[in-house]
UniProtKB/Swiss-Prot annotation:
PROSITE patterns cross-referenced by the UniProt entry: COPROGEN_OXIDASE
Protein family (similarity comment): Belongs to the aerobic coproporphyrinogen-III oxidase family.
Listed name of the protein: Oxygen-dependent coproporphyrinogen-III oxidase
Species this chain originates from: Synechococcus sp. (strain CC9902)
Reaction catalysed by this enzyme: coproporphyrinogen III + O2 + 2 H(+) = protoporphyrinogen IX + 2 CO2 + 2 H2O
Function: Involved in the heme and chlorophyll biosynthesis. Catalyzes the aerobic oxidative decarboxylation of propionate groups of rings A and B of coproporphyrinogen-III to yield the vinyl groups in protoporphyrinogen-IX.
Cell compartment(s), UniProt: Cytoplasm
Ligand binding (a divalent metal cation): H122, H132, H166, H196
Location of region: Disordered: 12-31
GO molecular function, one term: metal ion binding
Residue(s) at site: Important for dimerization: H196
Catalytic residues as annotated in Swiss-Prot or TrEMBL: H132 (proton donor)
Pfam families per UniProt: Coprogen_oxidas (PF01218)
Keyword field: Chlorophyll biosynthesis, Cytoplasm, Heme biosynthesis, Metal-binding, Oxidoreductase, Porphyrin biosynthesis
Amino acid sequence: MVRALIRRVLGRQENDQSTPQLELPPTDSRDRARSMVMGLQDEICAGLEALDGEGRFQEESWVRPEGGGGRSRVMREGRVFEQGGVNFSEVQGNELPPSILKQRPEAKGHPWFATGTSMVLHPRNPYIPTVHLNYRYFEAGPVWWFGGGADLTPYYPFLDDARHFHRTHQQACNSVHPNLHKVFKPWCDEYFYLKHRNETRGVGGIFYDYQDSRGTLYKGQDPTGAAAKVSSELGATPLSWEQLFSLGQANGRAFLPSYAPIVEKRHATSYGDRERDFQLYRRGRYVEFNLVWDRGTIFGLQTNGRTESILMSLPPLVRWEYGYTAEAGSREALLTDLFTTPQDWLGDPSLEERCRPHQAIN
């Protein structure tokens, strides 16, 4: 009876908007989504402990008074990872925050549920990139969607690392639908962009949000951007709840294969004060993005999430330098000139010519 009522209400809404009807999620959608992201947290933590060799995650469980809770796992002072965290959360409530209602006003007035896993790793060695991922699921009455992504933030440029990370996630996306990576790659470049610096946070990866069973893939905020253009050219790409569930699972499981080979290749590279200082300086961009632009941070703070877990993404050490300019022709200059602007990492052969003089190929 309840599901029939939802269908009638939803049908009226969709008919008014002249858009396809939203598929209802499975009756066990919340349990399955919760199990999926908890499983990803377990798999990733086990893989990272093996990769580090010495560091171990310390777990802290927490309860949200308004409903829900989670478990935060943090590694400090490992052999490879200076600090890293892998979170799981499941939260629910009756009043949605403004950041959600602005995007999906039809969710207003419905009790809501959200679950997800998020991770940020800050390696010690400047030649190993910082990495981030987040996969999540949201429901509010008849409204539901999946979101997620992963992105790589190098401090020293290596074309092979960027290509490997992108290729691995492209394969994961293609296992669900061939259109996905074509939109989610430029969407990632768009999302992880520091407008006040006019640069991307790193070399990107994939990003997607508000994915339900309707319409075109791009549901972002720049209707004239590259992701919107590709999405419009591809047209409607209807995906079922099951396909979108598989998308999060496939990309979550692609994380270790996308990142572990980079760590194994770079962790023994020697470095000095110059490289460490540049790493700490570039970490400042990470802090700026997360505190100024990141919607996940904003959502967590607006919904009385656990502050320690929300800000777990910040690096343990960071520095700012007024008016810094990289030395012309240096690897630091290549990083800031090439690796902080959107590139066709998998399809542009000219990148090799730009990287080769700086030993940034292998």
